[in-house]
Each structure stands twice: as structure tokens, then as C-alpha cells.
């Protein structure tokens, strides 16, 4: 997979961070690495004041570094900021951060030594992953997490995990992989540590997970609509044109396509004049969720292909300047927004499960119990659905903000973007489980109703039934639910 600093997407990130894909640098990316490093070398040679290169960091930004300090400042930068606290982040999250950092190096703004950038790439390709604690970033760059990653990658300390999940001292793991870290020069320590790539990487994984969650929501909402015997008029394109939300129209189009061939597409075959909101307004809620996710994807894609460096090299201007690009309010706010969209979709999903379980509303056996056996059917699963929804709603609460107390008042703002992105990703995972529960309920309702399904919903029903047979007698369903998560 070739990185170029411009075209990394959430779906590509999710793939390369998990499946062992080797990364390469594009020719133009290599050129940008060399050109940006030349600007840094010139600033050092001429002792031009550059934050974190020829001066100290944070509250020491006005202090010039001596010649003696310059030689070891990159190592000192990593050693002094490697404080990320356990529990450790999942391997995929750290590898996502590594991939984003490699990609953003190629913008030319970091000024990192090409040898250091290539060493990080080789460590990634060797399947080695730093052990990085999940606590330590406030979203004004992911400094402590980045330092922990950088120190391990350079063999200065910490631990690396290999493809077989064996954990070793970083220096030992590099030696076993026949990798020799290059010497760090000026700016290199800060380039490895001071960036927002953990936040962007986590958010990229969250968007990829949320896309799967939302597509599942849409498909299973259509199956529930069929099982319920819903009134199709709220999905009519002429009705939706009265309020021109494009995402609503797209969701409705996908649901109508899934229902193609159903007798319910003729409103005369609906069982009710007006359905419960969870059925009637699925399009509006899922459309709003899709819009929030689209905005998140746009912001995250920008962040994964942009510099979050401070300072940053302006290659064409031959300058190094201070920036605010390490600060990530766009990322934090859009992750909060998208998580709320998932919460809204999941809330209606749980409501539809309850409606499908109601004999009064569906005409089907209470709690979808098989009438020949005499069990409580899906009644216990309603508790599970609400438990999952409670967890998701908690994750979807906006992340709190306050004035930061860092750097003696110089660094007095934060975003907590990483926490927002982490919550967003976990919310998407819970959303997929809630949808799996709805899938089981909808499949059971379709079986009990006994009507032929349209072609695409018949395929979906068959996929569900391939991993979770029709529920007749009581049986544990936890394993079924996890299997359904994957097939839908």
C-alpha cells in the first residue's frame, strides 16, 4: 500500500492497521521528506529560533538551546514525555496511529529525518507495534502517547509486540527483526511525539466501524419494516421532497431497494394507517445519523492527510513556523456529533425490537415466542437491548471541556479529541450489537408471519438464519448475537 500524504481514507486505514499490509512511500512523498528536512537543517545551522528545534518546549519556548543541548534534545524530548498510562491501547489503534503518522510525514511539514521516517515504516511492516497506554492525551497534540510510541520504535525503552502477540523489550524486538534505529537528529524526537495522529487514527477506525453499524441499521430496519407490515408512505420520494434532506432521501432509496418486490410497497397492503415512530420515522433518524457520519468522515479524512505539526515546515517558502494545527476541535466535535447520531439510530432500533415483541401491535405471538412450545421468547433479550443502549447513550454524551492548566498558562486550551474518538468507536461497536438483536427479532417475526420475503430481504434473512436458527425452544443466544454482528 503506497502512502502519499493525500489519499488515506478511514476504510483503508482500518484495513492496513489490521491485516499486515506493507506500506511504501510514493516518490513525491520521499521528495517532500528530503526537501522539508533540508529546511530544518538550514535552521539549525543558522541558529534560527524554531520552537522545539533550536528552542525549548512549552513554557521554555523562549529559551535557546545550546550546542550541547541540541545534540541530545530529541532523545530528551522522548524520554521526558513517555508517560502514557495503562491500560494499553489495542494493537490496531496503535498501528492506525503509526500509519497516519507515516502518511502525514509525507506532507513535508514535519521536517523529520528521512531515515527516521523510513525506520518507522520498517517497524510497521515488520509487524512490530509499540505498547502504548491509553491515557495521557488532552487533544492538544497526543504528546505523551506519541512519545511512548516514538521511544519504543527507536529502541530507547518501552516494549514492542510482534505479530504473534509476543511482548519484548523494544531494543530486543528490533534486534530480533534485524532493524537498527538511526540516530535522532534535531527535530526528530518532536516529530515522533508531537502530533495528533493517535486521535486521527482512532477517529478513522471509528468512522469505518460506524459505517458498518449504519449500513446494518438500514438493512435491518427494512427487515423489521417487512416483519411489522409497515406503511411505506413515509418513504415515498415525493413525501421526502417536501423536506429536502438529501441523506433522508438516500436512506429511503436504500430501504425501498431492499423492499423491492414486497407487497408492502403498495400502501393499500399496510396493516396500519400510521405506524409507531420507530417504524414511521426510521428514514429521518437514519438519515440524520448518516449526515453526522458523513461530516465525521470528511473531517477525519482531512486530519489523516494533513499536518498536525508544531512547528511546521513550509517547504516552498523555505521556512519553519509555529502553528495551531496540532489542536483538534474539529475532530472532537464531529466525533461527539456522530456518536449522537448512532445513539439516535440505536434508540429507534431498541424501540422496534419492543414493537416486534408486542402481540397487540403486530398480531404475532407475544415476545415472538413459538406458539407450539410456550416460552418467554424474546422477553429476556429486551433487558439486553436496553443494557447495550444504556452503554451507548453514556458513550454518546459530549466530552467535557475546560481551560487547560498546562505550561504555566501558555497551553491553556484542550479538545480531548482522543476521548471523543474512542467513545465514538465504542458506541459504533455497541450499535452493531443492538442491530444484531433487532436482526434476530425481525427474522423471528418474519418466520412467524410466514409471508414470502422480497429477494434482497430473503437473502438477508438467510444469512441471519445461517448462523442463528429460528428460535423455538429456549437457548443461550450470546454466541448467536456475536455471529449475527459479523454477517449483517
Cite the ranges covered by each PLM segment:
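C-terminal auxiliary extensions adjacent to catalytic cores
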Residues: 1-21, 25-32, 36-44, 70, ...
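Residues that scaffold, gate, or flank divalent-cation-dependent active/transport sites
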Residues: 7-42, 46-53, 57-95, 101, ...
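Short loop/turn hinge sites at secondary-structure boundaries
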Residues: 19-20, 47, 80-83, 108, ...
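FAD-binding core of FAD-dependent oxidoreductases
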Residues: 51-73, 80-103, 131-154, 166, ...
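Generic short alpha-helical segment signal, independent of protein family or function
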Residues: 62, 78-85, 98, 102-105, ...
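Short gly/ser-rich anion-binding loops that grip negatively charged ligand groups
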Residues: 63, 83-87, 106-110, 286, ...
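FAD-binding glycine-rich core of flavoenzymes that anchor FAD
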Residues: 109-137
Amino acid at each position: 500500500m503506497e502512502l502519499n500524504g493525500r489519499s488515506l481514507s478511514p476504510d483503508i486505514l482500518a484495513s492496513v492497521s489490521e491485516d499486515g499490509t506493507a506500506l511504501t512511500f510514493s516518490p513525491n512523498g520521499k521528495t517532500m521528506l528530503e526537501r522539508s528536512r533540508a529546511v530544518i537543517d538550514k535552521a539549525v545551522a543558522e541558529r534560527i529560533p524554531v520552537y522545539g528545534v533550536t528552542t525549548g518546549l512549552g513554557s521554555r519556548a523562549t529559551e535557546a538551546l545550546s550546542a550541547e543541548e541540541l545534540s541530545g534534545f530529541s532523545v530528551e524530548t522522548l524520554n521526558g514525555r513517555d508517560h502514557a498510562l495503562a491500560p494499553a491501547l489495542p494493537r490496531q489503534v496503535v498501528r492506525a496511529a503509526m500509519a497516519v503518522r507515516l502518511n502525514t510525514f509525507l506532507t513535508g511539514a514535519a521536517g523529520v529525518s528521512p531515515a527516521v521516517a523510513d525506520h518507522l515504516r520498517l517497524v510497521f511492516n515488520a509487524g512490530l507495534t509499540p505498547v502504548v497506554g491509553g491515557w495521557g492525551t488532552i487533544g492538544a497534540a497526543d504528546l505523551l502517547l506519541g512519545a511512548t510510541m516514538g521511544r519504543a520504535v527507536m529502541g530507547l525503552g518501552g516494549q514492542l509486540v510482534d505479530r504473534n502477540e509476543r511482548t519484548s523489550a523494544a531494543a530486543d524486538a528490533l534486534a530480533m527483526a534485524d532493524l537498527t534505529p538511526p540516530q535522532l537528529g534535531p527535530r526528530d524526537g518532536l516529530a515522533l511525539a508531537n502530533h495528533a495522529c493517535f486521535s486521527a487514527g482512532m477517529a478513522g477506525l471509528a468512522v469505518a466501524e460506524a459505517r458498518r453499524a449504519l449500513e446494518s441499521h438500514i438493512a435491518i430496519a427494512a427487515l423489521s419494516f417487512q416483519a411489522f407490515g409497515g406503511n411505506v408512505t413515509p418513504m415515498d420520494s415525493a413525501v421526502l421532497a417536501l423536506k429536502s434532506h438529501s441523506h433522508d432521501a438516500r436512506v429511503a432509496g436504500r430501504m425501498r431497494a431492499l423492499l423491492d418486490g414486497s407487497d408492502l410497497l403498495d400502501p393499500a397492503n399496510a396493516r396500519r394507517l400510521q405506524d409507531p415512530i420507530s417504524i414511521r420515522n426510521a428514514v429521518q433518524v437514519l438519515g440524520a445519523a448518516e449526515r453526522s457520519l458523513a461530516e465525521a468522515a470528511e473531517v477525519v479524512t482531512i486530519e489523516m492527510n494533513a499536518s498536525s505539526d508544531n512547528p511546521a515546515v513550509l517547504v516552498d517558502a523555505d521556512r519553519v513556523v509555529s502553528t495551531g494545527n496540532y489542536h483538534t476541535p474539529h475532530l472532537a466535535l464531529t466525533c461527539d456529533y456522530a456518536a449522537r447520531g448512532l445513539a439516535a439510530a440505536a434508540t429507534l432500533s431498541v424501540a422496534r425490537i419492543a414493537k416486534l415483541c408486542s402481540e397487540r401491535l403486530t398480531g404475532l405471538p407475544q415476545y415472538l415466542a413459538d406458539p407450539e412450545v410456550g416460552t418467554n421468547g424474546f422477553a429476556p433479550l429486551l433487558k439486553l437491548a436496553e443494557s447495550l443502549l444504556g452503554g451507548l447513550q453514556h458513550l454518546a454524551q459530549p466530552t467535557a471541556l475546560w481551560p487547560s492548566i498546562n505550561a504555566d498558562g501558555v497551553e491553556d486550551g484542550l479538545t480531548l479529541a482522543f476521548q471523543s474518538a474512542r467513545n465514538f468507536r465504542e458506541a459504533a461497536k455497541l450499535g452493531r450489537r443492538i442491530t444484531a438483536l433487532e436482526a434476530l427479532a425481525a427474522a423471528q417475526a418474519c418466520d412467524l408471519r410466514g409471508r414470502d420475503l422480497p429477494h434482497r430481504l430473503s437473502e438477508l434473512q438467510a444469512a441471519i438464519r445461517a448462523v442463528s436458527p429460528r428460535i423455538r425452544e429456549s437457548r443461550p443466544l450470546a454466541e448467536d448475537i456475536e455471529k449475527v454482528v459479523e454477517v449483517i
